[in-house]
Amino acid sequence: MDENDLKYIEKVLGRKPNHIELAMFENLWSEHCAYRTSKKLLRMFAKTVNEKTSKNIVVGIGDDAAVIRLKNDICLAIAMESHNHPSYIDPYNGAATGVGGIVRDVLSMGAKPIALLDPLRFGDIFGKEGDKVRWLIEGVVKGIGDYGNRIGVPTVGGECEFDSSFDYNNLVNVVCVGLVKENEIITGKAKEPGLSLILIGSTGRDGIGGASFASKDLTEESEEERPSVQVGDAFSEKCLIDAVLEAVKTGKVKAMKDLGAAGLSGASSEMCYGGGVGCELYLENVVLREPLTPYEIMVSESQERMLLAVEPGSEEEIIEIFKKYELPASVIGKTIPEKRIIAKYKGEVVVDLPLDLLCEAPLYDREGKEDLKEKEDDKEKIKMPEDLNAVLLKLLESPNICSKEWIYQQYDHEVQIRTVVKPGKDAAVLRINEVYPMGIALTTDCNSRYCKLNPYVGAVNAVAEAVRNLATVGAEPIAMLDNLNFGNPERPERFWQLAECIKGLADAAEFFEIPVVGGNVSLYNETVIEGKEHPINPTPAIFVLGKVEDVEKVPGVLDNKIKEGDILIITNETKDEMGGSEYYKVIHNTEEGRVPRVDLEKEKKIYEEVREVVKEGLVSEAVDCSRGGLAVALAKMAVLNNIGLEVDLTEYNKNNLRDDILLFSETSGRIILAVRDENKDKVLSKLSSAYIIGKVGGSRLKIKINEKDVVNLDVEEMKKRYYEAFPKMMGEL
């Protein structure tokens, strides 16, 4: 907080806040809690929620998680969070507690957590910070795996992007999906006075100041802030999940909140302010792990804690449930009619603040300055390599394209036995037994390099790719969350990036008719070293939830598998759009060129058509063309299915592109489908922009252009490169 904030607080209060109240303001007025920079910009998302898109929204923006109706009374709670700063300082605990926190956000809605996804960003593994990057990867992946596995929630998807801009600020974003019946939904808003407040879990000294720590740049001295990183206990969280779900079944729980950022001061004030009441807290009743002062009790961010508002008279019944699971639980206060937070310690009032002041921080009006980095490429300088086989193999080994099996094999992705399509594909698919054969598809997306070059276009691309990924499994997008990861917004160029990305996400989501129902903003992902600024690439990571009508029709499921003789069809044309492409970066070390543009009208039609042919069970495999372009998508189709492909792009090359541009351009709107020969005419009749490019068979990937074999590779060789690259990078092969 700055001097103006302090003056404003003193003016409204008519006095100076005491040291506990000041700490509460510092946390609740932090960027992390109050969205002081972004709140005005986030209003752009309002246009995505309209009469058509809102019909299945049960709980929208403003709670710990959004709740979406899937079918009948079966609903899904969804939430997305970041744990970026803590995961750079202490990767294992930072990532583990990120998982714990997002699981509790979903749990606080009364939902059983059923899936996790983890969009991750790390620095250049081959660069000068390579050793640190490996250390961060090991810690983050182990933290996510250990915590998720121990609480019995499968990690079914995510992504992992590498770029030198993340050398000093890795990103750990986490998504959780939970299942809840509509009549058992709990919100985070206590709406009546006289409710008893029960705190579950014990409070220690860990994580004090975590919210304010997450609201500033990292510096060379940030290592000293390790105490701001919380420490998780997955076994306690597993007990907490089971106990909370049992307590919800009593019907006595009226509101519930996870104790995350700002600890008890945040959870109690937000719960009461959101419901239009106040609260009185008795801090001596809080169960402590060690002797703490009232100040420490109010701002501790100890993990595995929940605040419940319950019917008066039901306290003993609720506490007994938690005792059964050996979890500390105590009545620590009550809701009151006055919209204030009053905290007492052994009879003495230590906090007395109006909630509207505490929970409504003044918003910033920041200035933006255009910083468009996209520029034309010079094809005279960027020559086509002679050996395109070598180029494709090198791309299959690049960190952004190679298999991330090394990561996801550390996660249990099949616990709860719902997983139909596992990690490694374009979207995860889970069956929802309560409404079988219906299921859900889950995807996270963002190409931060596109967003650096052209933030608006990059953000539109993220939404288009998510919709495309869902189309490959026949899923209709029904809700979207965003996790906005940016540098220091006090610098006009970064604020401009933030505004442009939000505008791009909002415009694309509105066009594709996907309501944006929640998310998270993580700013100050920027480090200053010896006076030099190191901001991350703007990274508006998104999660899109899709509805699958029949999981048995999804390509690759049951007998619906790719086989010899299948015909290969591609949607949309390929254009010269090389800006930010993996090919240009890895092979030519440049980011020049035009970032792919999304033709919203055309692509919406393509995705709807692909969705329909997949839903009819006419597609045996579907692969999204994104990083690495058409050649990489074909290679991955061959590798993942252990089968050869014979492709001829001569007729398809309508734009007479140079061979390398045709193979590696990342034009949006392209999906490669494999279909049975007897179904090809039916499929083509349903697609408005589609071309036959080859067939499935043999043991090699052969790509011809104008009678010339431009690619001819053994599938086994491609598999070796694709699967061994990451373990080699981590020093294990």
From Swiss-Prot:
Reaction(s) catalysed (UniProt annotation): N(2)-formyl-N(1)-(5-phospho-beta-D-ribosyl)glycinamide + L-glutamine + ATP + H2O = 2-formamido-N(1)-(5-O-phospho-beta-D-ribosyl)acetamidine + L-glutamate + ADP + phosphate + H(+)
Domain of life, per lineage: Archaea
Keyword hit for Nucleotide-binding: yes
Signal peptide: none
Enzyme kind, highest EC tier: ligase
Cellular component annotations (GO), alphabetically ordered: cytoplasm
GO biological process, one term: purine nucleotide biosynthetic process
Binding site for ATP: 35, 482, 519
Location, primary (coarse class): cytoplasm
Pathway membership, UniProt: Purine metabolism; IMP biosynthesis via de novo pathway; 5-amino-1-(5-phospho-D-ribosyl)imidazole from N(2)-formyl-N(1)-(5-phospho-D-ribosyl)glycinamide: step 1/2
InterPro entries, per database record: PRibForGlyAmidine_synth_PurL, PurL_linker, PurM-like_C_dom, PurM-like_C_sf, PurM-like_N, PurM-like_N_sf
Entry EC no(s): 6.3.5.3
Matching SUPFAM superfamilies: PurM C-terminal domain-like, PurM N-terminal domain-like
Binding site for Mg(2+) 1: 81, 520
Name of this chain's protein: Phosphoribosylformylglycinamidine synthase subunit PurL
Annotated organism of origin: Methanocaldococcus jannaschii (strain ATCC 43067 / DSM 2661 / JAL-1 / JCM 10045 / NBRC 100440)
Originating gene: purL
